């Protein structure tokens, strides 16, 4: 089985200059934890995850808490977060895979790197995203005990 067989095609993406609030809203509305960050040419430039957003929100809060009072801390963190762009919190230079790579290889990369997803790139452009859930769904369809069940409705 290849990555192409399991990946999410045409994943939801975000621009590096989008406000962090837009990333939060998009992830919440679309119920995703990973957003590939692409430039205006569709080239992958990085990834922003729910973990990146938590770090962007809470790291300044801790610094503020240690250096100021609690009331001023919350006001300052809110203002800082509102001014931040995706590029300020995203991960640059992410590990990628190709559509034709074996899914087992992509899964091994995800496990070893502790990645929740891998962008799928062809010719420098994002064509898909393979997530932990995609790998589990693909695995579930190969197990004899669950063959015949619809993984989109029966298991999740």
List where the protein language model places each region.
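Tandem CBS (Cystathionine beta-synthase) repeat/Bateman regulatory domains
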Residues: 1-156
């Amino acid at each position: 089985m290849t990555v192409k067989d399991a990946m999410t095609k045409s994943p939801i993406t975000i621009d590096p200059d989008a406000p962090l609030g837009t990333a939060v809203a998009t992830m919440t509305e679309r119920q995703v934890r990973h957003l590939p960050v692409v430039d205006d040419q569709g080239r992958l430039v990085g990834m922003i995850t729910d973990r990146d957003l938590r770090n962007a929100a809470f790291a300044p809060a801790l610094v503020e808490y240690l250096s100021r009072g609690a009331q001023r801390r919350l006001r300052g963190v809110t203002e800082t977060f509102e001014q931040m762009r995706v590029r300020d919190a995203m991960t640059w230079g992410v590990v990628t895979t190709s559509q034709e790579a074996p899914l087992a290889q992509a899964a091994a990369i995800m496990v070893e790197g502790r990645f929740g997803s891998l962008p799928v790139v062809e010719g420098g452009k994002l064509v898909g995203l393979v997530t932990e859930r995609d790998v589990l769904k693909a695995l579930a369809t190969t197990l004899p005990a669950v063959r015949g069940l619809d993984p989109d409705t029966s298991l999740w």
